[in-house]
Design a protein with these regions (language model features):
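Conserved GNAT acetyl-CoA-binding A-motif
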Residues: 107-122, 129, 264-274
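Conserved active-site alpha-helix within GNAT-family acetyltransferase domains
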Residues: 97, 109, 121-139, 276-292
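Amide-forming acyltransferase catalytic core, primarily the GNAT-like/NAT-type
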Residues: 133-234
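A short, internal acetyl-CoA/4′-phosphopantetheine-binding micro-motif in the GNAT/acyltransferase core
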Residues: 84-91, 120, 239-250
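Short amphipathic alpha-helix that is part of the acyltransferase structural core
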Residues: 2-43, 148-191, 318-322
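Conserved catalytic-core motifs of GNAT/GCN5-like acyltransferases
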Residues: 73, 118-119, 136-150, 290-304
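A conserved beta-strand-loop-helix scaffold within acyl/acetyltransferase catalytic domains
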Residues: 28-62, 67-84, 223-235
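Conserved acetyl-CoA pyrophosphate-binding loop and the N-cap/start of the following alpha-helix
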Residues: 90, 94-102, 249-257
């Protein structure tokens, strides 16, 4: 898409409004220019356009859609920012900054609780936006992957809803769980592991307990996996680990068992976002996992409050023109 010939814009030219079905073609055109055409945006448009909380917005410049952002209400008091995109032809004018400020301000005016988002360590522009709008970087993860192991799991067994109390008690004692912000990860989004989410995962058969031979009835480790419903290639399902935790001495063995479980479930590969701590990464490496990227994943968070943190005011942003 070609920019406007004069490349000069005023505040009156820009409008941020709720996205509409008629915007689909423009949004797909923007997505086609991002990540070598592998942007996930086209795959979630239907869900986002039907968001019951109306958190899907586009930025238009002289009636042309040039940017997009999504505010997702994950639960009561739990908000997630995602989908910030600007047409490459219009980058460099501050539109991404305006969209980010708009999204933060919108949540502050209409919500409460915690607002979070994730981004790549290479995205310095978004990191600057995070700092100026009162976010803190609360955790760092590294994407790892491994081939499956075609042998039975040694000590993993599915857990049931009846196990929820002992799982919660075990998690509440886990320093790793606290460092992971008490959250599950699924395709770059993080969800607080509430009792309701734990119950849903248990009912779906997505939670496994790990017990060593010397304590067959005790919980020594925990593995929570994601379903395959978001897989891009359903015929080649990947075991995406939402959360994996064990004592440092058991972590490598549990990660090995996760690879075995993947084969048992008919998955072709295993992926996990591992907490960026030396002992954690070493344990995964010993279990055959390797880095899939040189870039880290940063998790940012801030409280939703009209008085806390940075002041976010659209009328204080810089002019749009160069």
């Amino acid at each position: 898409m070609q920019p406007f010939p004069d490349q000069t814009f005023t505040r009156a030219d820009l409008l941020i409004r709720p996205a509409q079905p008629a915007d689909r073609a423009a949004l797909e055109a923007i997505a086609a220019q991002i990540w070598d055409g592998n942007d996930y945006l086209p795959r979630v448009l239907d869900a986002w356009l039907n968001d019951p909380y109306d958190g899907f917005f586009v930025a238009t410049l002289r009636d042309r859609v040039i940017g997009v952002c999504k505010i997702t209400r994950l639960d009561e008091g739990e908000w997630w920012l995602e989908g910030l995109r600007v047409d490459p032809a219009f980058q460099g004018h501050g539109f991404g900054r305006i969209l980010h400020h708009f999204a933060v301000n919108h949540v502050r005016q209409h919500g409460q609780g915690v607002l979070r988002f994730s981004t790549s360590s290479e995205n310095s522009a978004v990191q600057r936006l995070a700092r100026e709008t009162g976010f803190s970087r609360v955790a760092v993860f590294l994407p790892l992957g491994a081939d499956v192991l075609a042998e039975p799991p040694a000590h993993l067994a599915p857990l049931t809803p009846a196990d929820a109390p002992r799982i919660r008690a075990w998690l509440d004692r886990s320093a790793h769980f606290a460092a992971c912000q008490r959250s599950l990860e699924w395709d770059w989004s993080f969800y607080f592991l509430t009792d309701a989410r734990l119950a849903e995962r248990l009912a779906a058969g997505l939670v496994y307990g790990w017990a060593a031979p010397d304590a067959p009835h005790g919980l020594r480790g925990l593995l929570i996996i994601n379903s395959t419903e978001r897989d891009r290639w359903p015929d080649q399902p990947v075991l995406k680990i939402a959360y994996l935790d064990a004592a440092p001495t058991d972590l490598t063995a549990l990660a090995h068992d996760a690879r075995r479980l993947a084969a048992q479930l008919g998955r072709v590969y295993v992926r996990v976002k591992a907490l960026d701590q030396p002992d954690v990464l070493s344990a995964f490496e010993a279990a055959g996992f390797r880095c899939e990227s040189d870039h880290h994943m940063y998790l940012y968070a801030r409280e939703v409050s009209l008085t806390a943190h940075a002041s976010v005011r659209l009328n204080e942003l810089p002019p749009l023109s160069r």
